[in-house]
């Protein structure tokens, strides 16, 4: 199973909450590495420098992320009632769950990136 965490708070909200010197934001307003950990670990207070005001994090995303990682840890399959069907990844269809405020399982979502990486180190 492959996912792309694409949810990100508004940059200005993170700066307003933390101050410019303490905020960790993407200059492009995109999700950053490890941004999902507060959601996975159900710890909205865990990293406000990255996610902003914990009280403003989307509760539905906190709940669905926690439930999905729990299902995967328990069964080896992330599927549960809170998200759409998550199809497993294989080299022909390349399904990926794209996670924003909602969840979308997309086929070959990042084809250009995948082809570039495959040229360097083929998926087996």
Enumerate the predicted regions with their spans:
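C-terminal helix-and-tail extensions that cap enzymatic domains
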Residues: 1-124
